[in-house]
Curated annotation (Swiss-Prot):
Keyword Iron: no
Subunit architecture: Interacts with VP4 and VP6.
Keyword Oxidoreductase belongs to the record: no
Gene from which the chain derives: S10
Protein name per UniProt: Outer capsid protein VP7
Predominant subcellular localization, coarse grouping: virion
Amino acid sequence: MPAHMIPQVARAVVQSTYSGSLSAIDDNLEPTDDIDQAAYITTGRYVVCALCLATVSDSPTQLSRWVFHHCSDDRRPLIRSMLLASSRHAHALRESREVDMRRISRLVHQADEEDELDAPRQARRIGYVDLHSCDLQNPTPELATRQLCNDPTRTHSTHPHLARSHPYMLPTAALDIDPPEPVTMFATMSRTDGVPMLFNMTHRNVEVLASPAARASLMYALLKLANAKLTPKQRSIMYGPSANDMVAACTKACAATTFRHVGRYAARVVIEE
């Protein structure tokens, strides 16, 4: 396998493990449900040796490559461990989805369909706001928390920004929305990675939604309000990574210039605390 593919394959293996979609391949390069017979693992796209990450095939429908790949027998315990972990995550996700779906009907409302006065007193009102990432002239953490983008080629000087040098701080900015009441939390997500995040306007920081239940609830509500469908990549990010992986993904997304505004929706999301 080319060296440049190792991170890509490793990331696919990790995501498949956390999303519960990792499956087993036997010595004959055939899918199997018997963990003890597993010689390789597949992410759905790559058939991989779990020990050395050698790519046996780029596709489960083309299992003719590297048939004579031989690696240490020590890989079988590792494969078994990864498959069991994937199975546990799949079971946990099924349970969390069931819980989320029940809670969503009770906790999530669209403002144009239900009187906002009926929202619980302790409810936290969440709005959707545009988010941009900019190259600042002096990208220091201190200035990153205070300076707005002055790029004349863009027309979003009134938007809150995330500076690339300090991805977890939201600079003070004049919001271009006029909420009917004070809004302290704004929700958005990376257009490249689909990572859902909450922006705490009081503390000026970013909260990555590490809880699978919280991620599922918020993402489902936002996509429902946006009338959008969940793509496989977004679903993988939403349910798959652990808290540490979510933070890493958020850091990468926030620090990239490809982190653009994702749109703003008139509907409000009300989630009970």
